[in-house]
A protein has these predicted regions:
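Hydrophobic residues in well-ordered beta-strands that form the structural core
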Residues: 56, 94-95, 119-121, 150, ...
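Beta-loop-alpha module in the N-terminal Rossmann-like domain of NAD(P)-dependent dehydrogenases
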Residues: 21, 39, 52-111
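Core-facing hydrophobic residues within beta-strands of well-ordered domains
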Residues: 31-33, 66, 146, 194
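Predominantly a Rossmann-like dinucleotide-binding segment in NAD(P)-dependent oxidoreductases
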Residues: 125-209, 214-218
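NAD(P)-dinucleotide binding in Rossmann-like oxidoreductases
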Residues: 207-211, 222-305
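N-terminal Rossmann-like dinucleotide-binding module
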Residues: 1-50
Length: 306
């Protein structure tokens, strides 16, 4: 493969996210979607639409047919599929989390490091322009030093979501590993390293073995404190996906789910509505505020990640 040739790609797992990866790769000039791997025979139709081949098992894909892989399978499969990709010398992007346990994740990362092959993790929201702008505002102290943040991720997943994949009712299929991990990555990117975490979880909404809600308190090394309310069992307008419209599976609301507080102002995220003193002074609780919204380009960060 020359540097100008498109990257021959296999997408492993064609569920909610895998289908999006496949469609983005099909329309991307730098990629040649070669294979879709999924045990569901109905995915053959999708492969035909995207002008690629389908296989029920990764073992049926010749090693020489691809240069890279995207793994979008259930969490417990990330390690075995990742090691198979490694054995075939494929650069690999694995959907978050990198694996279902810390030990499995360390095994996969170590194996790729020893081989000198790229292993990427799909934290695609860092490619959203609102992240870049928020990071710029915090880094430059445009609103003064960062003090605190409050995050909500609250949606109601339909029953069909759980019926489509039994693994979503197991210990590695709850909103902490599937959904909160995105918020955690954004917090690390914006607020820096973590010093301390306290949390409580509950499964009282569905009564299953996996959590359906959580409350989390995070202290960062900088002294910043953040609170998180998380649930996949409550109907609400508050989620990054709803606010940004980045995920076609989740209805857009346009309502930001984060509040970020600084000494001279605060802002909502990802919508970037900024609140400051109405007169442009330092301000305090006795003075009126003004607000303005910073506009950013409307993009699909999953596509930008490629």
């Amino acid at each position: 493969m020359s540097r100008n040739d498109p990257i021959r790609l296999v997408v492993i797992g064609a569920g909610l996210v895998g289908q999006r990866h496949a469609r983005h790769a099909f329309s991307h000039q730098d990629f040649d979607l070669a294979w879709i791997v999924d045990p569901n025979e109905a995915r053959q139709e999708m492969a035909q639409q995207l002008e690629c081949r389908w296989a029920a098992s990764l073992e049926d894909v010749p090693a020489g047919d691809c240069d890279a892989a995207i793994i979008a399978t259930p969490n417990a499969d990330h390690l075995p599929s990742g090691l198979t990709c490694l054995a075939r010398n494929w650069a690999t992007l694995v959907e978050k989390p990198v694996a279902e346990t810390i030990a499995s994740g360390e095994t996969l990362v170590s194996a790729f490091e020893v081989a000198g092959l790229p292993l990427l993790v799909g934290h695609h929201r860092r490619y959203h322009p609102s992240f870049d702008k928020a990071n710029e505002m915090i880094s430059s102290a445009a609103l003064g030093p960062l003090i605190s943040a409050s995050l909500i991720w609250a949606v109601r997943k339909p029953d069909s979501y759980f019926k489509a994949g039994a693994w979503r009712r197991d210990s590695d299929g709850g909103p902490l590993l599937i959904n909160f991990i995105h918020e955690a990555d954004l917090m690390l990117g914006l607020f820096g390293p973590v010093d301390e975490v306290q949390a409580m979880v509950s499964s009282h909404a569905r009564g299953s073995t996996v959590e359906d809600s959580a409350a989390i308190l995070v202290r960062f090394a900088s002294g910043v404190i953040a609170t998180v309310m998380l649930t996949d069992a409550a109907l609400s307008p508050w989620s990054f996906e709803g606010a940004s419209g980045e995920n076609p599976t989740i209805a857009e609301t346009g309502i930001s789910s984060w509040r970020i507080g600084c000494t001279a102002g605060s802002f909502e995220f990802p919508g970037l509505r900024v609140w400051t003193d109405a007169q442009g002074d330092e301000g305090d609780w006795s003075r009126p505020l003004k607000d303005e919204t910073i506009e950013t380009a409307r993009v699909d960060p999953l596509h930008e990640q490629l």
